[in-house]
Every structure is written in structure tokens, then in C-alpha cells.
């Protein structure tokens, strides 16, 4: 899935909005949330004390994406993988992120509920993990958060799957998204 200027702007806008919404919440919850994190880190989602390799971080989000595509029988899927910094400096730790678009069939609200139901039947939990807030339909499972919304082209839905902040490799200068469409679509 090649990056276009519009895709980059959308991603940066979403990240900025998410950061603006999450930072005040994390600041207030950091002292009461018990979650292992790196010594000296003030980010409760940073579990880099138990790091994931690049391959593990990628598998953490690619495997669930494959399952979702199959379970919901998503059509015309396009998908890309990248590493996303878990802080606003672009420094480690990173999380694996899958962004996928899929063709909406019929009413988008009804179709999103179809996808949601398929995910719930495969063990996903409705809503975001405790302490996280998203717009759109959000589910989580095994450290992965999936958020669904309309894509810019309203004939498509978009799902973003984010893994845990446990990859400590420096991806600061990685600007590439790896096309993983063929890994998600069954021949």
C-alpha cells in the first residue's frame, strides 16, 4: 500500500488527535495503573522491559489481521505494515501497526457491525483496553487494539491494528510501509 501525501497527512492528523486525547488520560492514570514497564519510563503502555523483536512485533498484528480478513470475509483488501513510535519524539519503543482497507458491502454501519460480530466470535473484546480511548468501533485481544472507521474513499472501511509498545529497535528513520496485502488474502 504506497504512501500518498493524503495518507501521510491523515496518519499524522490521527496520531496528533490520538496523542492529544490520550496524553492527559495517561498522565492522570499512570500512578494507579499496574502494568510492567521499563524502569524510568513514565509511559504505562511501554513494556520495553520485555521487548519484542521486529518479527515478533510484526506477527503480533499481522496474524490477527489475517484472522479478521478470513472471519469477516473481507473483500478487496489492501494492507500495509509499519512500525509506529509510542512517543511523540519518534524514539523507541515502537509498536507494530497494520493499516488495512476493505470494500464496504451495503450500509457501512451494518457492515462494520458484521465485522465486529465476526471478531467477537473469535475472542476479541468489545471496546478499547482499559485507559485507552478511540473514535469508531474498537476491539482488543492479546495486546492488539483494532479500530474501524470509514476510509477517505467512503466505499471502503479502514481498520488499524496496533500492537504493544515492546519493540526497542530504533525505527526512527523508517518511512516505509511494507505492503502485506498478499499475506492477508487467501488465494
From Swiss-Prot:
Keywords: Cell membrane, Lipoprotein, Membrane, Palmitate, Signal. It is found in: Cell membrane. The keyword Signal applies. A lipid is attached at residue 29 (N-palmitoyl cysteine). GO terms for cellular component: extracellular region; plasma membrane. Residues 1-28 form the signal peptide. A lipid is attached at residue 29 (S-diacylglycerol cysteine). Disulfide bonds: none annotated. It is a lipid-anchor. This is Putative lipoprotein LppJ. It comes from Mycobacterium tuberculosis (strain ATCC 25618 / H37Rv).
Amino acid at each position: 500500500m504506497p504512501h500518498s501525501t493524503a495518507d501521510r497527512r491523515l496518519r499524522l492528523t490521527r496520531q496528533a488527535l490520538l496523542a492529544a486525547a490520550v496524553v492527559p488520560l495517561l498522565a492522570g492514570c499512570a500512578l494507579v495503573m499496574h502494568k510492567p514497564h521499563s524502569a524510568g519510563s513514565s509511559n504505562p503502555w511501554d513494556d520495553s522491559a520485555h521487548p519484542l523483536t521486529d518479527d515478533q512485533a510484526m506477527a503480533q498484528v499481522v496474524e490477527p489481521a489475517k484472522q479478521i480478513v478470513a472471519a469477516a470475509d473481507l473483500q478487496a483488501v489492501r494492507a500495509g505494515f509499519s512500525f509506529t513510535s509510542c512517543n511523540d519524539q519518534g524514539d523507541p519503543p515502537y509498536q507494530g501497526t497494520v493499516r488495512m482497507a476493505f470494500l464496504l458491502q451495503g450500509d457501512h454501519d451494518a457492515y462494520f457491525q458484521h465485522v465486529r460480530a465476526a471478531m467477537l466470535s473469535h475472542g476479541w473484546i468489545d471496546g478499547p483496553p482499559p485507559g485507552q480511548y478511540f473514535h469508531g468501533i474498537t476491539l482488543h485481544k492479546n495486546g492488539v487494539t483494532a479500530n474501524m472507521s470509514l476510509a477517505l474513499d467512503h466505499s471502503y472501511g479502514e481498520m488499524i491494528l496496533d500492537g504493544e509498545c515492546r519493540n526497542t529497535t530504533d525505527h526512527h528513520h523508517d518511512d516505509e510501509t511494507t505492503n502485506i496485502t498478499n499475506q492477508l488474502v487467501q488465494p
